[in-house]
A protein has these predicted regions:
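Short N-terminal edge-element motif at the start of the domain
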Residues: 1-30
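Alpha-helix boundary/N-cap detector
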Residues: 3, 7, 11, 80-90, ...
Length: 178
C-alpha cells in the first residue's frame, strides 16, 4: 500500500467511523451502509438506511408495495444521506483539495491514477470499518449491505458489492442492480 493510499484511506476510515457510530446511537436496525462519491471521485460521504427509517419513509410518502425495493437501496432518498459530513469529513475534504492542486486534469493518465487511488482508499476504509465489527452494532453483519457506491451508479458498484459482502447476503440488492 502506498503512503498516499494509506493516508487517504485512514482519513476516510476515521471520518466514516465517527459518522456511522454517531448514527448508530439511535439504535435502529441498519441494512444499508455505504460510502458515496461522484463519478469524479470527489470527497465521499456516507448514506444509510434502517428498517425503521424505511418504514417511516413508506408510511409518510405512501409508497406502493411494488416500488419499495427501489427506495430501500436509494442513497438519494435516505434520511441519512451525507450524515455527519459537516462534522466529520472536513479533514477528508482538505486532503482531496490538496491532491487536486497536484493534478493536471488535462493529463488523462494522471487523472485515472488519481481516480483509482481515491476509490481504492474508500474501499480500504470500508474494509477496515467492516473488520472493526461496526456494521454489527444494532443487527447481525449478514443483514447489512455495505459498499462504496458512485453517484450516479455504474457497474463497478456491483464489483465492489461482491468484494465487500457475501453474495448470499445481498441477493435482493443484486436482483435489483446486478
Amino acid at each position: 500500500m502506498t503512503p498516499e493510499l494509506q493516508l487517504l484511506g485512514d482519513a476516510i476510515f476515521e471520518a466514516a467511523k465517527k459518522a456511522f457510530l454517531k448514527l448508530f446511537e439511535n439504535r435502529e436496525h441498519y441494512y444499508y451502509c455505504v460510502v458515496l462519491t461522484t463519478g469524479e471521485a470527489l470527497p465521499p460521504c456516507i448514506a444509510a438506511w434502517s428498517v425503521e427509517a424505511l418504514e417511516r419513509f413508506i408510511n409518510e410518502n405512501a409508497i406502493p408495495q411494488e416500488e419499495i425495493p427501489y427506495y430501500k437501496y436509494s442513497f438519494a432518498d435516505s434520511p441519512y444521506y451525507a450524515f455527519g459530513y459537516e462534522e466529520y469529513f472536513q479533514q477528508v475534504v482538505q486532503l482531496f483539495e490538496q491532491r487536486d492542486s497536484l493534478i493536471d486534469y488535462n493529463n488523462e493518465e494522471q487523472w485515472n491514477e488519481e481516480y483509482n487511488l481515491r476509490l481504492a482508499a474508500m474501499v480500504y476504509a470500508m474494509k477496515k470499518l467492516d473488520e472493526t465489527g461496526i456494521f454489527a452494532f444494532n443487527q447481525p453483519r449478514e443483514q447489512v449491505y455495505i459498499n462504496v457506491e458512485l453517484m450516479p451508479p455504474d457497474d463497478t458498484d456491483i464489483e465492489r458489492a461482491l468484494s465487500l459482502n457475501n453474495p448470499d447476503n445481498i441477493e435482493e440488492w443484486l436482483s435489483i442492480f446486478g
